[in-house]
């Protein structure tokens, strides 16, 4: 399976510091005046002309099996995922979406799957620093009625 990873950032809206119209170009997934999130590279430092939601759809059309969508606005903040971004991507394509960027507790995982319509969640810091175990996360989600593969024994 090929996973298309997208690093997305919210774009300035009309009247804010930078206009989306400055980045408009001709490609099938390029930014337009209606774009809410752009695709960024180099850890969110370099902008592209791609609209994140359109790019996810185009990637699916080209054969990607899953989309890994990371909000560069919430990544590392541990304040929760960008649920609006997740819903926009998840609701626009038919392949699985993996949420990334923002998990600070187990409720955030649930929110990304439930409110964000994601199919899976990526979490790093909450596991790296021993705040939760993968087993605890799976149990939390299962207790809330989400279909979860049972934990395997070490």
Q: Regions from the language model: what does each represent?
A:
Residues 111-152:
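C-terminal helical cap(s) of enzyme catalytic domains, especially alpha/beta-barrels
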Residues 1-68, 73-74:
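Conserved anion-binding
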Residues 2-6, 67-69, 97-101, 119-123:
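Hydrophobic faces of well-ordered beta-strands that scaffold small-molecule active sites
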Residues 12, 84-121:
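Catalytic cores of alpha/beta
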Residues 49-53, 79-88:
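Charged helix-capping and loop-helix junction motifs
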């Amino acid at each position: 399976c090929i996973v298309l990873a997208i690093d997305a950032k919210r774009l300035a809206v009309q009247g804010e510091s930078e206009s989306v119209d400055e980045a408009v170009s001709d490609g099938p997934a390029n930014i337009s005046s209606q774009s809410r999130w752009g695709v960024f590279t180099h850890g969110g430092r370099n902008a592209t002309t791609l609209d994140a939601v359109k790019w996810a759809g185009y990637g699916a059309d080209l054969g990607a099996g899953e989309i890994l969508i990371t909000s560069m606005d919430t990544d590392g903040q541990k304040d929760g995922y960008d649920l609006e971004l997740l819903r926009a991507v998840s609701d626009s394509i038919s392949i699985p979406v993996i949420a990334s960027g923002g998990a600070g507790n187990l409720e955030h995982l649930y929110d990304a799957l439930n409110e964000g319509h994601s199919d899976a969640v990526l979490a790093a810091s909450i596991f790296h620093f021993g705040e939760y175990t993968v087993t605890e996360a799976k149990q939390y989600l299962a207790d809330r009625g989400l279909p979860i593969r049972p934990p395997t024994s070490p």
